[in-house]
């Protein structure tokens, strides 16, 4: 792992330990059991069935590599705007220290619309998956660069037992081989290298030959223009996770519509 990823994972382990002391597992299970569920994978497939791109629209205030992306940041308004302009699902950053995210942002965004929501965070422990369910998330992210294969498989199984969808994220062919051992249909290819933070959409295009037909390829990071979208769709990649391009726009939902529809 890179220095930045090492640092993030170390912080996550500390956060999990603190959260477990604050909210015991049984209490969290009660919260999780009270939440309704929205079909994350089904929402993506419905867009595909209609011949449309499926956009997982991200709500992200900042990132370690780009700093603050959006000063005027009202998650509920952004969520409504995305829903009104054709998003299939939402992705909400809940990491506080590195991305200025919040659990509250996810709760506010989900309450503001009917779209399924991905908890975007660095998952290292099953406790975080139960947290995701308790806060209302419909899907979680597993990052191959941060997890070994047995742990990733264990975390996926636990997520599925809670009826959460799993998006597994990779950046290179070795990580893709690891991801293909999972059952989830959602394969995210991060065009940003978490070791160097360099970005190229070639990362997605160069791995398409590895992916079985029954999986859904989600291209992540570096999709900044209609030309990038057209390049991906020409390669039969029709599912996108986009944050920065929308967050930097005056009207995030309108930018989504301009780029994709």
From Swiss-Prot:
EC number(s) given by UniProt: 4.1.1.48
In terms of domain of life, where is this protein from? Bacteria
Q: Which GO terms describe its molecular function?
A: indole-3-glycerol-phosphate synthase activity; phosphoribosylanthranilate isomerase activity
> Annotated pathway, please?
Amino-acid biosynthesis; L-tryptophan biosynthesis; L-tryptophan from chorismate: step 4/5
Instruction: Report which reactions are catalysed by this protein.
Output: 1-(2-carboxyphenylamino)-1-deoxy-D-ribulose 5-phosphate + H(+) = (1S,2R)-1-C-(indol-3-yl)glycerol 3-phosphate + CO2 + H2O
Lineage at the top is: Bacteria, Pseudomonadati, Pseudomonadota, Betaproteobacteria, Burkholderiales
Q: Which UniProt keywords apply?
A: Amino-acid biosynthesis, Aromatic amino acid biosynthesis, Decarboxylase, Lyase, Tryptophan biosynthesis
Q: Which family does it belong to?
A: Belongs to the TrpC family.
Q: Which organism is it from?
A: Burkholderia multivorans (strain ATCC 17616 / 249)
Q: Which Pfam families match?
A: IGPS
Q: Which GO terms describe its biological process?
A: L-tryptophan biosynthetic process
Q: What class of enzyme is it?
A: lyase
Please identify the protein, giving its name as recorded: Indole-3-glycerol phosphate synthase
Against PANTHER family, the record matches this protein to: INDOLE-3-GLYCEROL-PHOSPHATE SYNTHASE, TRYPTOPHAN BIOSYNTHESIS PROTEIN
């Amino acid at each position: 792992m890179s220095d930045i990823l090492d640092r993030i994972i170390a912080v996550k382990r500390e956060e999990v330990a603190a959260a477990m002391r604050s909210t015991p597992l049984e209490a969290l299970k009660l919260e999780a059991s009270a939440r309704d569920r929205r079909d994350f994978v089904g929402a993506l497939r419905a867009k595909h069935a209609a011949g449309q791109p499926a956009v997982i629209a991200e709500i992200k205030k900042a990132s370690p590599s780009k700093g603050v992306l959006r000063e005027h940041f009202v998650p509920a308004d952004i969520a409504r705007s995305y829903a009104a302009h054709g998003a299939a699902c939402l992705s909400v950053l809940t990491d506080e220290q590195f991305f200025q995210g919040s659990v509250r942002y996810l709760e506010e965004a989900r309450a503001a619309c009917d779209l399924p929501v991905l908890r975007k965070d660095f998952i290292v422990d099953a406790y975080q998956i139960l947290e995701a369910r308790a806060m209302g998330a419909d899907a979680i992210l597993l990052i191959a660069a941060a997890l070994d294969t047995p742990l990733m498989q264990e975390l996926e199984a636990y997520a599925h037992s809670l009826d959460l969808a799993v998006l597994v994220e990779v950046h290179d062919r070795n990580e893709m081989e690891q991801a293909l051992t999972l059952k989830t249909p959602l394969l995210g290819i991060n065009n940003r290298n978490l070791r160097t933070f360099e970005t190229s959409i070639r990362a997605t295009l160069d791995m398409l030959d590895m992916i079985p037909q029954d999986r859904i390829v989600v291209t992540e990071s570096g999709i900044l223009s209609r030309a990038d979208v057209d390049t991906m769709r020409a390669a039969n990649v029709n599912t996108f996770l986009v944050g920065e391009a929308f967050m930097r726009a005056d009207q995030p939902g309108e930018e989504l519509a301009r780029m994709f529809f």
